[in-house]
Amino acid sequence: LFNVLTGIYAADAGELVFDGKRIDGFKPHRVAQHGIARTFQNIRLFSSMTALENVMVGRHLRTRTGVLGAVLRTIAEEQAIVQRAHELLDYCGLAARANDLARDLPYGDQRRLEIARALATEPLLLALDEPAAGMNATETAALKELLERIRADGITLLLIEHDMKLVMGLSHSVTVLDYGVKIAEGEPAAVQRDAKVIEAYLGGSVS
């Protein structure tokens, strides 16, 4: 579903409409330009680039000349990109890591760096594919605080996640799929009590 939404896979049928515009058939960079950013279950950073440079790559999607147009950008434009990248690193708690290589960052920081890079595209919707995967309790708590801040700042979060404590603590609405079929949707507390959900995920019947 995430791969269809973000232009990696094409839908077999139907239309994909976001913010009143059809985006089915768009390549990932065009989807991003229309306001959808994503992170991946398996972290996809530029490991040999610094944290700052990784965020700048995301920011280039919002410039007139794109990633390959560095020679065409003015000094002022490039300075603005650098400044915004620094602001996003600070926003995500990574200001002190700006000049560190992505590969040298702790796992939790790499997760937050991927979010910072996604935010650099100025999304309306941030799609997060298992953002807490592999995190310890402390890292997950820090992630939750960051996501709550992003949501409070007006960006819609679309979350795939198996950490139910995180899901229930963050979500306004939860949709449950069982082998690709939607079996429940609604407020977190109601979905958590749903008999179909309990049976599908706990493997037993509910009286």
Q: What residue spans do the PLM features occupy?
A:
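Glycine-rich phosphate-binding loops of nucleotide-dependent enzymes
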Residues: 1-207
